[in-house]
Amino acid sequence: DFESGCTLQERRAEKECQEDIVKERFFQIFDKEKIQKVCEAADAQYVQINKKIGMFVRKSTKQNRHCGNGYFYIGMYFRVLLSMLLDSDWTDTEKFFQNEELKQRISKKEIQKIWQQSIQCFENYLNHEIRNKAENGQSLQAVRQEISERCYEEAEKETRLYRLTVPTGAGKTLSSLRFALYRAERTQKQHIIYVAPFNSILSQNADEIRRAVDDPDIVLEHHCNVILSEKKQEKDYKKLTETWDVPIIMTSAVQVLNVLFSGQKRDIRRMHTLCNSVIIFDEVQAIPKKCMELFNLAVNFLTNFAESDVVLCSATQPSIKDLKENNLSECMEMTEIIEKYEEAF
């Protein structure tokens, strides 16, 4: 301003907020009564959430499990809300600047159809590509079949948190995926998320899972070693990694831990994707010990408050039962004890 000598930033800092005008214009666009009802409903929901968290913490303490502090779970709820706010705001802003229509995401009806088709393809893959292979051997195949059937049966139950402890070579990837597909279809889950600690495991299993569901477009492989040849592919891939808006997500433990705990907005944005999902943690024993207590609490939140089902897979489960605090909530074994299968492998 040449007259006053003030910069634009200084003028903005000095300018009083015309609150009355802001309110008047805001309610010209939005219905005041409707907003008030939404706020009242949100307040009532918050009260119910607090009660639910309190009951969970008291119950776990009474059972001498000590599954964490209620403030942690409240913080997770706030993180999910912030995630939805960031995702909706960034998506809307991107479409506005690109002058594109804001598309609807995959509907419940569409995702159910995807799960049904994937199950059909998966069972065909098991029958023709796996069970009929001569090199598998009858005794080994019988054990793998038993493990797979147990996982299939558990998909019909109501348990939210499982351990799948079977020897290396017992087919835990396909068995856990079988559980995930049937559970996702039965309970109308939005995503299946497969998590592994090493990119080599991810790349290997991603190829097999794509073949198993017979539709590479519904599988996102998200880790630093993914290389794409075309610029359009890179652009589309980048968008998907920002939102995880795809039915089956295969990613690293680092990515998931960032989504759960990082302060970066790009990580927080994906937090809501972990809700209403089936999540498979492969080789869970590789998660660093210093992260284990926070990991336990995050799994508790996902399975007790976020409508997700979690499977912890390993040939040797980490010793996490004897922690003084921050334990996992009740966890069911998906199969028989590991000693039963070790002789076969």
Write out the residue ranges for each language-model feature.
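SF2 helicase catalytic motif II
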Residues: A253-L257, K265-F305, V310
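Conserved pre-motif I regulatory segment
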Residues: N127-T165
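Walker A/P-loop
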Residues: E158-L181
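Interdomain hinge/linker at the junction between the two RecA-like core domains of SF2 helicases
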Residues: S229, T316-F345
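Pre-Walker A (Motif I) flank of P-loop NTPase domains
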Residues: K157-R163, Q190-H191, D245-V246
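Conserved Walker A/P-loop ATP-binding site and its immediately adjacent core
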Residues: A180-L181, Q188-V213, V226, S319-K321
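Inter-Walker segment of RecA-like/P-loop motor cores
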Residues: D214-F261
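N-terminal accessory nucleic-acid engagement/regulatory domains that precede
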Residues: D1-K133
